[in-house]
Amino acid sequence: MLAPRNTETGVPMSQTEADLALRPSPALTSTGPTRLGPPPRRVRRFSGKAEPRPRSSRPSRRSSVDLGLLSSWSQPASLLPEPPDPPDSAGPTRSPPSSSKEPPEGTWMGAAPVKAVDSACPELTGSSGGPGSREPPRVPDAAARERRREQEEKEDTETQAVATSPDGRYLKFDIEIGRGSFKTVYRGLDTDTTVEVAWCELQTRKLSRAERQRFSEEVEMLKGLQHPNIVRFYDSWKSVLRGQVCIVLVTELMTSGTLKTYLRRFREMKPRVLQRWSRQILRGLHFLHSRVPPILHRDLKCDNVFITGPSGSVKIGDLGLATLKRASFAKSVIGTPEFMAPEMYEEKYDEAVDVYAFGMCMLEMATSEYPYSECQNAAQIYRKVTSGTKPNSFYKVKMPEVKEIIEGCIRTDKNERFTIQDLLAHAFFREERGVHVELAEEDDGEKPGLKLWLRMEDARRGGRPRDNQAIEFLFQLGRDAAEEVAQEMVALGLVCEADYQPVARAVRERVAAIQRKREKLRKARELEVLPPDSGPPPATVSLAPGPPSAFPPEPEEPEADQHQSFLFRHASYSSTTSDCETDGYLSSSGFLDASDPALQPPGGLPSSPAESHLCLPSGFALSIPRSGPGSDFSPGDSYASDAASGLSDMGEGGQMRKNPVKTLRRRPRSRLRVTSVSDQSDRVVECQLQTHNSKMVTFRFDLDGDSPEEIAAAMVYNEFILPSERDGFLSRIREIIQRVETLLKRDAGPPEAAEDALSPQEEPAALPALPGPPNAEPQRSISPEQRSWAAFSTSPSSPGTPLSPGAPFSPGTPPVFPCPIFPITSPSCYPCPFSQVSSNPYPQAPSSLLPLSSSASQVPLPSSSLPISAPLPFSPSYPQDPLSPTSLPVCPSPPSLPSTTAAPLLSLASAFSLAVMTVAQSLLSPSPGLLSQSPPAPPGPLPSLPLSLASCDQESLSAQTAETENEASRNPAQPLLGDARLAPISEEGKPQLVGRFQVTSSKEPAEPPLQPASPTLSRSLKLPSPPLTSESSDTEDSAAGGPETREALAESDRAAEGLGVAVDDEKDEGKEPLLGGSSPILSHPSPVWMNYSYSSLCLSSEESESSGEDEEFWAELQNLRQKHLSEVEALQTLQKKEIEDLYSRLGKQPPPGIVAPAAMLSCRQRRLSKGSFPTSRRNSLQRSDLPGPGIMRRNSLSGSSTGSQEQRASKGVTFAGDIGRM
């Protein structure tokens, strides 16, 4: 008791003071002595803030398992005796969690004694808590490291390739991304492109060997497909997986899911997305169906349509798997019942099954509901599908357009469903290009002219079309092309250059839709009119006398383009307007197949006595149209050829009618023709085969190295011909080889051999359709080589009696001039006229044909209206030298010749074959004559039919070789054929503004005045050439050769220069004009039928020595021929449907496009591809700069025969009717 009071001693006092200093603090903060623990804790907490705070917070983030371990470790540690460490040293640095975590810490310890010890001995707790807080962090770190190691091992396993393709390019990873009933899809990698791919393993254990082989072939075929809306196939091979053979497919990896997953996620698809994705699915299906042979998906559904994430487009997948699925589920419902068309259950289906499935896909996309979800099993679905009951979800479709499309796709009858083309042309799937084309008036289905409106969207009006600012224009079916119309609009400034493609595409789609609609209506009307049991009429009518064919033809029903009654066809369709093909019946030389039943009257029927046939030069094949009542086309009208297309002209007159009884068509058969023959290095023949399924196949074979059996076997193997057609194909190939070899020998043989080979007994006829029945009636036939070589092997009709003066031609029965003999002697020949009204018998003379070369080719040329003089009798002084037979022997008309003939067709034999024609020099002699013409007079009832044959002006070519070559196109031999009704100048009407589009209307030709006969026949003949018509036309010398003609010539040259034309200047001003002074220039142009000069036809002995120059001509001719054939083949492929359409209408009122084809050249130019012509040619699209009918383009074989390389290289036009210039 005294110690505390002793204040002098510092030690006891300091201890007491220390105790006193420590006691009041708990008294202030605590209510009892049992709370002695918190003060030291507070001190440790104070010291703990400085250093170990982050460490003390770690246990609060551990799991309950780790915390339990901590509690179990801390209990024994707390009961151990703690060394007497000062609280200042150990306690502050190793403190457990702060007091804020005290209640959880109590739960960690979980024992009352621990709490007592903790409260009574805080130093022990602090010291024991130190080791406890050090050990637990090491245990969770080890577990985390273990988990991290396992994750890395798993990733290494997944990223390690488990399989490799046989070539080592593709790797397979053990990452499964999809699984189906018969396939498993893994992630793969293309090591060449480092692009991820899909590795698909298909189970084929249930397939037989044949089915497995078939599936492998299908997969090989699918590997070549590449389309933006088709999942790409990269590779495939067979593999063994777990002892089972499987097929591995490597395809494009689609990581954004399918349409099915999209519908599950978003439930409702927006109309714009539905439109875009449906259009892309249609494009993919169209690509598949347009392959040869067509590829059917057979299992199209939303599960098989994949989404490409980055581009937002869709692609069709799982191609070719329907074969596998059908075998895998042979005893159950095959495919997906909800998307299967009714005919799928019968396994007799075509492309229509994919259209049905597409309709169901659209239904699911529009409603987000699975089709036939109300059915409980596949049997109920089958009953509904076969009975035509639509799914309940069909009536939930809100958009009428979508509902109409779905209804048209899921019809029970596959013939009533939409086609892919119909769907792509539907307004719902039409792309918004800012261009709209619509009909300005209701379509009656008959008129060839469509009045259309073109509306352009205005961006300033929110994309709506400009009101009352539509461009109205007239589109002539069969004559106009969408590209030409669009390019004219660009040239006229109506649309900008950037809108050329959208406008052309919009016009083309609208016109195609109208034509499809018309075709459906026409077929419906025919089915109503025709009885179903009408059989094809017999078509095996023999031709007139001649050697029988090597094999008889099979009776074949006349096609739509066979109902004609003329011998030679002329194709005067615009080469860019139609997508048809004429190879089946119209060869490149323009000859009609003689097997055409419409051209073969019964054998017992005699021909009309008025139909006399004359023999014309071998380079010609022409006929005169009958001028019946109501016939308003003339030879000039019918002979408007597209010079650049290389096609002959087709002049079907309005008077032609086909028997409406027969329009049913039989299955098409294969047709074969020769397109070219080459004997330069190897003797190679190029043929074109139209297969039974209307496909065009071009193949070549070596005459020396390939046998007909090998060719036929290859054709059968590739399914180009049917096995039943093999024998007929063999016969035709053998005949082709025989005839080609004969022709090649003729080319190399003497003139006598050529003369005998091309005897008048041979008449062009057609090869029959293969195969032919053995008992069919024999017919005359011509091989495909004869058709392709027809330009230089055209044979005249059989000889007959000469024309008597008392047998004039009546207007109703004009004569037909198949192939006459043409005399050639001197360098400059001019035609001599022949009139059907003759006072003297025409002298009969032996006929001979020109020896012609294999490289020669026909050159059809354009023409305009024909100026015809009155009947001109022959002069008695006409030379009758048997060695120079300029006479025209008249041949009796065989029964095969029609009563109604077509317009003249002329084939140019060879524009460049100079040396070859010299062999005929010794056989021919000059036959000069002069024809003086009378003034015009009104037309009389008697038709004038002068045939002008060439007579020669004695002039040397040695000093004027270049001049004569440049004048080649101005000095052709022009046989002029007339009729009682002739066409005047085909002037174009003044341009009118139809809406905003400048349209020029063409008028019907009227009758021109005929010129009376002249009783005299002079020594020298010069036919008049046409003056300038419209802006540019042919030129000619005037009667006196005065300044008027020179001025007209200069104007013509200037007009030609505006079109990019190179026209030679007049070089023979000093020459005396050959036309009589009293002969006026005719008021309408003469047709340009031929385009070669006498530098190539009338030869001298000097030219035969220039072999080097001839070789250049042959090379140039061969190049032009190849170009011509390629153009013709392309055009024929494009024109098939249109020509069939036009022919099928011949039984009804024919459209004006057929009646007056001469307007085709004067109305619109061919399409000029963008960037392929200079600016001057682009500007020539203006109406004021169009070339006249007498102008020809020289970008095809029908160009000028001049020797100038510059003019050959240019793609301009040249005047072809300057006959009066030498």
Curated annotation (Swiss-Prot):
**Tissue range of expression?**
Locates to the distal convoluted tubule, the medullary collecting duct and the cortical collecting duct of the kidney. Expressed in pancreatic duct.
Q: Where is this cross-link: Glycyl lysine isopeptide (Lys-Gly) (interchain with G-Cter in ubiquitin)?
A: 154, 172, 183, 223, 238, 325, 384, 390, 447, 451, 990, 1123, 1136-1137
Entry keywords, A to Z? ATP-binding, Cell junction, Isopeptide bond, Kinase, Nucleotide-binding, Phosphoprotein, Serine/threonine-protein kinase, Tight junction, Transferase, Ubl conjugation
Which coenzyme or cofactor does it need? Mg(2+)
Write down the top EC class of this protein: transferase
Q: What is its EC number?
A: 2.7.11.1
The UniProt note on how this protein's activity is regulated states: Activation requires autophosphorylation of Ser-328 and Ser-332. Autophosphorylation and subsequent activation is inhibited by increases in intracellular ionic strength: Cl(-) potently inhibits WNK4 kinase activity via direct binding. Also inhibited by K(+) ions.
Summarize the impact of residue 559 to K.
No effect on inhibition of SLC12A3
Q: Where is this protein found?
A: Cell junction, Tight junction
Indicate, by first and last residue, each region the UniProt record lists as having compositional bias (Pro residues): 533-553, 935-944
Q: Which reaction does it catalyse?
A: L-seryl-[protein] + ATP = O-phospho-L-seryl-[protein] + ADP + H(+); L-threonyl-[protein] + ATP = O-phospho-L-threonyl-[protein] + ADP + H(+)
What's the effect of swapping residue 183 to M?
Abolished serine/threonine-protein kinase activity without affecting ability to regulate localization of TRPV4 and SLC12A9
The biased composition feature labelled Low complexity covers 90-101, 627-638, 757-769, 793-807, 877-890, 1014-1032
Phenotypic consequence of gene deletion: Embryonic lethality. Hypomorphic mice do not display hypokalemia and metabolic alkalosis, but show low blood pressure and increased Na(+) and K(+) excretion under low-salt diet. Phosphorylation of OXSR1/OSR1, STK39/SPAK and SLC12A3/NCC is significantly reduced in the hypomorphic mice.
**Keyword Kinase among record annotations:** yes
Q: Where does ATP bind?
A: 181, 251-254, 301
Tell me where in this chain the Protein kinase domain is found.
171-429
Compositionally biased region (Polar residues): 1-17, 953-963, 1172-1183, 1195-1207
| Chief location bin | other
Q: Which residues form the active site?
A: 318
Question: What family does the database annotate?
Answer: Belongs to the protein kinase superfamily. Ser/Thr protein kinase family. WNK subfamily.
- What does the entry note on its domains? The RFXV motif mediates recognition with downstream kinases OXSR1/OSR1 and STK39/SPAK.
Q: What is this protein called?
A: Serine/threonine-protein kinase WNK4
Organism, per UniProt? Mus musculus
